[in-house]
């Protein structure tokens, strides 16, 4: 990713956590090297300039979007990791501690995700095909 608007937009819309985190990390690297460059010796500024040349320029608003997208993607996958932890013998209290929430909140989060998975999929191919089969009969 070279930092142009199209590649940043593509990363943010990709659903690929690694691409999204790269946008976030590039912003933070750029900020860090700019701070170093502003306060260092000539040698430090030269080193910072070298590193800045290799980091994609990411706007603060793009970084905020990347942050929000990363949180969304990670939270969406949390239920699966909770399932793995439970299967490995973790208690709800341990899971809650790992997440920084209560055991009840961890249990409630997992329950809500399971309920979402049980909802009918509006793009259920089998249901769509069943309608075609019904049409053949009529």
Q: Which ranges hold each PLM region?
A:
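Short alpha-helical "packing" element that flanks the helix-turn-helix/winged-helix DNA-binding module
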Residues: 81-82
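Short amphipathic helical patch at the helix-1/turn junction of helix-turn-helix
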Residues: 85-87
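Short, charged low-complexity linear motifs
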Residues: 10, 78, 90-96
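Short, Lys/Arg-enriched anionic-surface-contact patches
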Residues: 55-78
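Short, flexible helical or helix-coil boundary motifs
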Residues: 28-31, 59, 121, 135
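Generic alpha-helix initiation/capping and coil-helix boundary signal
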Residues: 41, 53-56, 78, 98-99, ...
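General nucleic-acid-binding
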Residues: 1-54
């Amino acid at each position: 990713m070279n930092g142009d608007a199209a590649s940043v937009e593509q990363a943010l819309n990709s659903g690929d956590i690694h691409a999204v985190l790269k946008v976030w990390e590039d912003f933070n690297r750029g900020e860090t090297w700019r701070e170093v460059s502003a306060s260092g010796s000539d040698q430090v500024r030269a080193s910072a300039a070298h590193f800045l040349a290799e980091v994609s320029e990411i706007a603060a608003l793009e970084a905020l979007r990347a942050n929000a997208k990363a949180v969304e993607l990670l939270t969406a996958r949390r239920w699966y990791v909770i399932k793995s932890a439970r299967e490995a013998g973790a208690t709800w209290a341990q899971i809650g501690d790992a997440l920084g929430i209560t055991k009840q909140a961890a249990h409630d989060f997992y329950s809500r995700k399971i309920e979402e998975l049980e909802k009918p999929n509006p793009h259920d191919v089998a249901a769509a095909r069943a309608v075609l089969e019904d049409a053949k009969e009529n």
